[in-house]
Amino acid sequence: MIPALFLAAALGGMLRFLLSKIGPYVGTFIANMAACVVLAAVRDASPLVMAAVGTGFAGALSTWSTLAKELGTLIRQRRWAMLLGYTTATILGGMVAVWCGLQI
């Protein structure tokens, strides 16, 4: 189980790195939405799949710390409309992404 977890986490981390090259906000948003879909999709999987794909891949792909940094930057820059839009899109988008994952 541990090698599968490590491999999946490495793949999730590499994908997040590639998505970060799109730019701030967009790359983070895509990574977090994709992780929501993946995690919801494997909810009933075997413990090995849940550990590898859910914890490893989706855990490494998603990024709470980068989201917090980006929101903090928007607050410091007093970009209130962007802050509200990004926060709302992330919350609502996450719910839609989970719903999509549950349909798989």
UniProtKB/Swiss-Prot annotation:
Subcellular location: Cell membrane
Reactions catalysed, as given in the entry: fluoride(in) = fluoride(out)
Activity regulation summary: Na(+) is not transported, but it plays an essential structural role and its presence is essential for fluoride channel function.
Keywords of this entry: Cell membrane, Ion channel, Ion transport, Membrane, Metal-binding, Sodium, Transmembrane, Transmembrane helix, Transport
GO MF annotation: an example: fluoride channel activity
Membrane topology qualifier: Multi-pass membrane protein
Transmembrane segments: 22-42, 48-68, 82-102
Entry's Gene Ontology cellular component terms: plasma membrane
Top-level taxon: Bacteria
Primary role: Fluoride-specific ion channel. Important for reducing fluoride concentration in the cell, thus reducing its toxicity.
Family: Belongs to the fluoride channel Fluc/FEX (TC 1.A.43) family.
Name this protein carries in UniProt: Fluoride-specific ion channel FluC 2
Species this protein is from: Corynebacterium diphtheriae (strain ATCC 700971 / NCTC 13129 / Biotype gravis)
